[in-house]
Protein backbone atom coordinates (compact mmCIF):
# COMPACT_ATOMS: atom_id res chain seq x y z
CA UNK A 1 0.00 0.00 0.00
CA UNK A 2 1.27 3.48 -0.90
CA UNK A 3 -0.01 6.97 -0.10
CA UNK A 4 1.16 10.33 -1.39
CA UNK A 5 3.79 11.09 -3.96
CA UNK A 6 3.20 11.85 -7.60
CA UNK A 7 -0.10 10.97 -9.21
CA UNK A 8 -0.18 7.99 -11.55
CA UNK A 9 -2.05 7.67 -14.83
CA UNK A 10 -4.01 4.53 -15.70
CA UNK A 11 -4.74 4.80 -19.42
CA UNK A 12 -7.29 1.98 -19.25
CA UNK A 13 -9.42 3.96 -16.79
CA UNK A 14 -9.68 7.15 -18.89
CA UNK A 15 -13.10 8.26 -20.07
CA UNK A 16 -14.71 11.64 -20.52
CA UNK A 17 -16.87 12.64 -17.55
CA UNK A 18 -20.12 14.60 -17.46
CA UNK A 19 -19.02 16.63 -14.42
CA UNK A 20 -15.47 17.14 -15.64
CA UNK A 21 -12.90 19.62 -14.39
CA UNK A 22 -13.07 21.36 -17.76
CA UNK A 23 -16.83 21.70 -17.37
CA UNK A 24 -16.50 22.88 -13.76
CA UNK A 25 -14.30 25.78 -14.86
CA UNK A 26 -16.03 26.54 -18.15
CA UNK A 27 -18.09 29.49 -16.87
CA UNK A 28 -14.82 31.24 -15.96
CA UNK A 29 -13.56 31.00 -19.57
CA UNK A 30 -9.99 30.31 -18.41
CA UNK A 31 -6.80 30.42 -20.38
CA UNK A 32 -5.00 27.10 -19.93
CA UNK A 33 -1.21 27.15 -19.63
CA UNK A 34 1.33 24.37 -19.21
CA UNK A 35 1.69 25.24 -15.52
CA UNK A 36 0.45 27.58 -12.83
CA UNK A 37 3.82 29.30 -13.01
CA UNK A 38 3.32 30.20 -16.66
CA UNK A 39 -0.19 31.43 -15.89
CA UNK A 40 1.13 33.61 -13.08
CA UNK A 41 3.94 35.08 -15.17
CA UNK A 42 1.41 35.90 -17.90
CA UNK A 43 -0.82 37.59 -15.30
CA UNK A 44 2.11 39.57 -13.88
CA UNK A 45 2.59 41.24 -17.26
CA UNK A 46 -0.76 43.00 -16.91
CA UNK A 47 -0.05 44.53 -13.50
CA UNK A 48 1.12 48.11 -13.28
CA UNK A 49 4.58 48.66 -11.86
CA UNK A 50 4.74 49.05 -8.13
CA UNK A 51 4.80 46.98 -4.96
CA UNK A 52 3.22 43.53 -4.76
CA UNK A 53 2.06 42.38 -1.32
CA UNK A 54 2.49 38.63 -0.90
CA UNK A 55 1.43 36.42 2.02
CA UNK A 56 4.39 35.27 4.06
CA UNK A 57 3.63 31.58 3.37
CA UNK A 58 4.03 31.07 -0.34
CA UNK A 59 5.80 28.88 -2.87
CA UNK A 60 9.08 30.31 -4.13
CA UNK A 61 7.81 30.03 -7.72
CA UNK A 62 5.33 32.82 -6.93
CA UNK A 63 8.13 35.03 -5.67
CA UNK A 64 10.08 34.34 -8.87
CA UNK A 65 7.07 35.17 -11.05
CA UNK A 66 6.96 38.68 -9.57
CA UNK A 67 10.71 39.25 -9.76
CA UNK A 68 10.23 42.41 -11.83
CA UNK A 69 8.26 44.08 -9.04
CA UNK A 70 9.06 45.34 -5.56
CA UNK A 71 7.88 42.70 -3.08
CA UNK A 72 6.65 43.01 0.49
CA UNK A 73 5.15 40.30 2.65
CA UNK A 74 2.12 40.51 4.90
CA UNK A 75 1.61 38.20 7.84
CA UNK A 76 -0.83 35.40 8.48
CA UNK A 77 -2.40 34.08 11.66
CA UNK A 78 -1.41 30.62 12.92
CA UNK A 79 -4.52 29.23 11.18
CA UNK A 80 -3.29 30.73 7.88
CA UNK A 81 -5.85 33.52 7.71
CA UNK A 82 -4.83 36.98 6.54
CA UNK A 83 -3.61 39.24 9.36
CA UNK A 84 -5.63 42.24 8.20
CA UNK A 85 -4.04 44.67 10.64
CA UNK A 86 -0.61 43.86 9.24
CA UNK A 87 -1.77 43.95 5.62
CA UNK A 88 -3.59 47.27 6.03
CA UNK A 89 -0.51 48.79 7.65
CA UNK A 90 1.46 48.06 4.45
CA UNK A 91 -1.02 49.51 1.96
CA UNK A 92 -0.28 52.78 0.20
CA UNK A 93 -0.50 54.29 -3.26
CA UNK A 94 2.59 52.38 -4.39
CA UNK A 95 0.91 48.99 -4.00
CA UNK A 96 -0.17 47.74 -7.42
CA UNK A 97 -1.46 44.31 -6.35
CA UNK A 98 -2.27 42.16 -3.35
CA UNK A 99 -1.74 38.43 -3.77
CA UNK A 100 -4.52 36.56 -1.99
CA UNK A 101 -3.95 32.93 -1.09
CA UNK A 102 -6.36 30.34 0.28
CA UNK A 103 -4.68 27.40 2.00
CA UNK A 104 -5.25 23.64 1.70
CA UNK A 105 -8.93 23.92 0.76
CA UNK A 106 -9.91 26.51 3.36
CA UNK A 107 -11.22 29.82 2.00
CA UNK A 108 -10.33 33.12 3.65
CA UNK A 109 -13.23 34.28 5.89
CA UNK A 110 -15.88 36.56 4.43
CA UNK A 111 -14.97 39.39 6.83
CA UNK A 112 -11.40 39.40 5.53
CA UNK A 113 -12.57 39.41 1.91
CA UNK A 114 -14.88 42.34 2.63
CA UNK A 115 -12.02 44.31 4.22
CA UNK A 116 -9.88 43.62 1.16
CA UNK A 117 -12.62 44.74 -1.21
CA UNK A 118 -12.98 48.00 0.70
CA UNK A 119 -9.22 48.55 0.64
CA UNK A 120 -9.14 47.89 -3.11
CA UNK A 121 -11.71 50.65 -3.64
CA UNK A 122 -9.66 53.02 -1.49
CA UNK A 123 -6.19 52.34 -2.94
CA UNK A 124 -6.92 51.08 -6.45
CA UNK A 125 -4.75 47.95 -6.37
CA UNK A 126 -5.53 44.69 -8.16
CA UNK A 127 -6.20 41.42 -6.36
CA UNK A 128 -4.45 38.37 -7.77
CA UNK A 129 -6.16 35.37 -6.21
CA UNK A 130 -4.32 32.06 -6.03
CA UNK A 131 -7.01 29.38 -6.18
CA UNK A 132 -4.60 26.46 -6.43
CA UNK A 133 -5.57 25.13 -2.99
CA UNK A 134 -9.21 26.24 -3.08
CA UNK A 135 -10.49 25.83 -6.64
CA UNK A 136 -12.77 22.89 -5.77
CA UNK A 137 -14.10 24.73 -2.70
CA UNK A 138 -14.94 27.86 -4.68
CA UNK A 139 -13.71 28.87 -8.12
CA UNK A 140 -13.26 32.55 -7.24
CA UNK A 141 -13.98 34.96 -4.41
CA UNK A 142 -12.82 38.55 -5.08
CA UNK A 143 -9.86 38.17 -7.43
CA UNK A 144 -9.47 40.42 -10.44
CA UNK A 145 -7.25 37.66 -11.78
CA UNK A 146 -7.24 34.07 -10.52
CA UNK A 147 -4.37 31.63 -10.97
CA UNK A 148 -4.58 27.90 -10.37
CA UNK A 149 -2.09 25.04 -10.72
CA UNK A 150 -4.35 22.11 -11.50
CA UNK A 151 -1.68 19.42 -11.43
CA UNK A 152 -1.71 19.54 -7.62
CA UNK A 153 -5.09 17.77 -7.63
CA UNK A 154 -4.93 14.83 -10.05
CA UNK A 155 -2.83 13.11 -12.68
CA UNK A 156 -2.01 15.90 -15.09
CA UNK A 157 1.38 16.15 -16.81
CA UNK A 158 1.01 19.93 -16.92
CA UNK A 159 -1.72 22.46 -16.47
CA UNK A 160 -2.47 25.87 -15.00
CA UNK A 161 -5.51 28.11 -15.40
CA UNK A 162 -5.81 31.90 -15.53
CA UNK A 163 -9.22 33.54 -15.28
CA UNK A 164 -11.12 36.44 -13.74
CA UNK A 165 -12.92 39.65 -14.70
CA UNK A 166 -9.69 41.54 -15.44
CA UNK A 167 -8.33 38.91 -17.81
CA UNK A 168 -7.26 40.43 -21.10
CA UNK A 169 -4.67 39.92 -23.81
CA UNK A 170 -6.20 36.70 -25.11
CA UNK A 171 -4.64 37.45 -28.49
CA UNK A 172 -1.13 37.22 -27.01
CA UNK A 173 -2.06 33.96 -25.33
CA UNK A 174 -3.22 32.46 -28.62
CA UNK A 175 0.25 33.05 -30.08
CA UNK A 176 2.00 30.98 -27.40
CA UNK A 177 3.26 27.54 -28.48
CA UNK A 178 1.75 24.40 -27.00
CA UNK A 179 3.79 22.47 -24.49
CA UNK A 180 4.86 18.92 -25.20
CA UNK A 181 4.77 17.03 -21.89
CA UNK A 182 4.97 13.44 -23.11
CA UNK A 183 7.86 12.59 -20.78
CA UNK A 184 6.01 13.47 -17.59
CA UNK A 185 2.96 11.61 -18.88
CA UNK A 186 5.22 8.61 -19.46
CA UNK A 187 6.37 8.83 -15.84
CA UNK A 188 2.76 8.81 -14.63
CA UNK A 189 1.96 5.76 -16.75
CA UNK A 190 5.09 3.99 -15.51
CA UNK A 191 4.07 4.63 -11.91
CA UNK A 192 0.66 3.09 -12.60
CA UNK A 193 2.33 0.00 -14.08
CA UNK A 194 4.68 -0.24 -11.09
CA UNK A 195 1.88 0.03 -8.54
CA UNK A 196 -0.21 -2.70 -10.15
CA UNK A 197 2.82 -5.00 -10.42
CA UNK A 198 3.02 -5.01 -14.20
CA UNK A 199 6.46 -3.43 -14.55
CA UNK A 200 9.41 -3.00 -12.18
CA UNK A 201 10.17 0.62 -13.06
CA UNK A 202 10.25 2.47 -9.74
CA UNK A 203 13.67 4.05 -10.31
CA UNK A 204 12.78 5.02 -13.87
CA UNK A 205 9.59 6.93 -13.08
CA UNK A 206 11.14 8.64 -10.07
CA UNK A 207 13.97 9.84 -12.30
CA UNK A 208 11.48 11.10 -14.89
CA UNK A 209 9.57 13.08 -12.26
CA UNK A 210 12.76 14.55 -10.85
CA UNK A 211 14.13 15.61 -14.23
CA UNK A 212 10.86 17.07 -15.50
CA UNK A 213 10.42 19.05 -12.27
CA UNK A 214 13.95 20.41 -12.62
CA UNK A 215 13.17 21.38 -16.21
CA UNK A 216 10.04 23.22 -15.07
CA UNK A 217 12.05 25.10 -12.45
CA UNK A 218 14.49 26.22 -15.14
CA UNK A 219 11.84 27.09 -17.73
CA UNK A 220 11.50 30.75 -18.70
CA UNK A 221 9.26 30.45 -21.76
CA UNK A 222 5.46 30.53 -21.58
CA UNK A 223 3.39 27.75 -23.13
CA UNK A 224 -0.21 26.80 -23.62
CA UNK A 225 -1.35 23.52 -22.11
CA UNK A 226 -0.60 20.42 -24.17
CA UNK A 227 -3.37 18.75 -26.14
CA UNK A 228 -3.07 15.62 -23.99
CA UNK A 229 -3.31 17.48 -20.68
CA UNK A 230 -6.28 19.46 -22.00
CA UNK A 231 -7.96 16.16 -22.86
CA UNK A 232 -7.30 14.87 -19.35
CA UNK A 233 -9.28 17.79 -17.91
CA UNK A 234 -12.33 16.15 -19.48
CA UNK A 235 -11.60 12.77 -17.86
CA UNK A 236 -11.61 13.83 -14.19
CA UNK A 237 -14.95 13.99 -12.36
CA UNK A 238 -14.77 17.16 -10.25
CA UNK A 239 -17.74 16.18 -8.08
CA UNK A 240 -16.40 12.71 -7.31
CA UNK A 241 -12.97 14.17 -6.54
CA UNK A 242 -14.47 16.55 -3.97
CA UNK A 243 -16.70 13.92 -2.35
CA UNK A 244 -13.85 11.45 -1.85
CA UNK A 245 -11.49 14.08 -0.48
CA UNK A 246 -14.10 15.35 2.00
CA UNK A 247 -14.77 11.81 3.20
CA UNK A 248 -11.08 10.98 3.64
CA UNK A 249 -10.39 14.30 5.35
CA UNK A 250 -13.25 13.88 7.82
CA UNK A 251 -12.20 10.32 8.70
CA UNK A 252 -8.57 11.29 9.26
CA UNK A 253 -9.52 14.44 11.18
CA UNK A 254 -11.69 12.41 13.57
CA UNK A 255 -8.94 9.85 14.08
CA UNK A 256 -6.32 12.55 14.71
CA UNK A 257 -8.58 14.10 17.33
CA UNK A 258 -8.24 10.88 19.33
CA UNK A 259 -4.51 11.58 19.45
CA UNK A 260 -5.04 15.20 20.44
CA UNK A 261 -4.05 16.60 17.03
CA UNK A 262 -6.09 18.86 14.76
CA UNK A 263 -5.74 20.49 11.33
CA UNK A 264 -4.01 23.85 11.08
CA UNK A 265 -6.75 25.38 8.93
CA UNK A 266 -10.47 25.65 9.57
CA UNK A 267 -11.86 23.87 6.51
CA UNK A 268 -15.64 23.99 6.10
CA UNK A 269 -17.52 20.72 5.69
CA UNK A 270 -18.60 21.66 2.16
CA UNK A 271 -15.08 22.73 1.13
CA UNK A 272 -12.71 20.47 -0.77
CA UNK A 273 -9.41 19.85 1.05
CA UNK A 274 -6.09 19.55 -0.75
CA UNK A 275 -4.33 17.80 2.14
CA UNK A 276 -4.73 17.67 5.91
CA UNK A 277 -2.04 19.95 7.39
CA UNK A 278 -0.95 19.47 11.01
CA UNK A 279 1.70 20.90 13.31
CA UNK A 280 4.12 18.20 14.44
CA UNK A 281 6.83 18.08 17.07
CA UNK A 282 9.53 16.52 14.88
CA UNK A 283 8.43 16.88 11.26
CA UNK A 284 11.52 15.57 9.52
CA UNK A 285 11.83 12.51 11.75
CA UNK A 286 8.14 11.67 11.40
CA UNK A 287 8.26 12.19 7.64
CA UNK A 288 11.19 9.76 7.37
CA UNK A 289 9.33 7.15 9.42
CA UNK A 290 6.25 7.49 7.25
CA UNK A 291 8.35 7.05 4.13
CA UNK A 292 9.54 3.71 5.50
CA UNK A 293 5.87 2.68 5.33
CA UNK A 294 5.46 4.09 1.79
CA UNK A 295 3.57 7.15 2.99
CA UNK A 296 4.92 10.24 1.23
CA UNK A 297 4.01 13.65 2.62
CA UNK A 298 4.68 16.90 0.79
CA UNK A 299 6.45 19.84 2.44
CA UNK A 300 4.60 23.14 2.09
CA UNK A 301 6.96 24.86 1.56
CA UNK A 302 10.73 24.68 1.96
CA UNK A 303 11.69 28.12 3.28
CA UNK A 304 13.45 30.23 0.66
CA UNK A 305 14.96 32.77 3.07
CA UNK A 306 13.55 35.82 1.27
CA UNK A 307 12.86 38.67 3.73
CA UNK A 308 13.03 36.16 6.56
CA UNK A 309 12.43 38.70 9.34
CA UNK A 310 9.03 39.54 7.85
CA UNK A 311 7.96 35.89 7.64
CA UNK A 312 8.07 34.18 11.06
CA UNK A 313 5.16 31.85 10.37
CA UNK A 314 6.63 30.76 7.04
CA UNK A 315 9.80 29.64 8.81
CA UNK A 316 7.77 27.72 11.38
CA UNK A 317 5.65 26.03 8.72
CA UNK A 318 8.73 24.95 6.79
CA UNK A 319 10.08 23.21 9.89
CA UNK A 320 7.02 21.91 11.71
CA UNK A 321 4.07 21.35 9.35
CA UNK A 322 3.24 18.01 7.78
CA UNK A 323 0.79 17.70 4.88
CA UNK A 324 -1.06 14.39 5.17
CA UNK A 325 -2.45 12.90 1.92
CA UNK A 326 -6.24 12.46 1.69
CA UNK A 327 -6.81 12.63 -2.06
CA UNK A 328 -9.24 10.76 -4.29
CA UNK A 329 -6.86 7.86 -4.95
CA UNK A 330 -7.55 6.53 -1.48
CA UNK A 331 -10.36 4.68 0.25
CA UNK A 332 -11.15 3.93 3.87
CA UNK A 333 -8.49 1.22 4.09
CA UNK A 334 -5.77 3.66 3.00
CA UNK A 335 -6.81 6.28 5.55
CA UNK A 336 -6.94 3.68 8.32
CA UNK A 337 -3.45 2.50 7.33
CA UNK A 338 -2.21 6.10 7.52
CA UNK A 339 -3.83 6.57 10.91
CA UNK A 340 -2.44 3.32 12.32
CA UNK A 341 1.03 4.33 11.19
CA UNK A 342 0.69 7.78 12.75
CA UNK A 343 -0.46 6.16 15.98
CA UNK A 344 2.71 4.04 16.00
CA UNK A 345 4.85 7.18 15.85
CA UNK A 346 2.63 9.52 17.86
CA UNK A 347 5.62 10.47 19.99
CA UNK A 348 6.97 12.34 16.95
CA UNK A 349 3.56 13.84 16.18
CA UNK A 350 2.73 15.66 19.41
Language model features: what each stretch is:
Residues 143-198:
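Active-site PLP attachment segment
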Residues 6-8, 13, 27, 31, ...:
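PLP-dependent aminotransferase class I/II
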Residues 80-86, 138, 155-161, 308-311:
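Short, charged, surface-exposed secondary-structure boundary motifs
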Residues 13-24, 29-30, 38-122, 134:
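PLP-dependent aminotransferase-like
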Residues 22-25, 62-68, 136-143, 194-199, ...:
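Short loop/helix-cap segments at secondary-structure boundaries that form the rim of catalytic
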Residues 122-123, 293:
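Helix C-cap/helix->beta junction micro-motif
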Amino acid sequence: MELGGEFYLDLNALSEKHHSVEGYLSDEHPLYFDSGRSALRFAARSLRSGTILLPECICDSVITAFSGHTLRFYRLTPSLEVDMDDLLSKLNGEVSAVFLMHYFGAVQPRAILEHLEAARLQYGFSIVEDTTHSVFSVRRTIGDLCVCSLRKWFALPGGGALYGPALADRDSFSLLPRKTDARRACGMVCKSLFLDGTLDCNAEYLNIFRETEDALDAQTELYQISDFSRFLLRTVDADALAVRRRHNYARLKDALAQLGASPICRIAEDACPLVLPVWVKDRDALRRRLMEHRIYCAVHWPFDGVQADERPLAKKLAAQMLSLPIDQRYDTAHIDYLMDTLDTYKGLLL
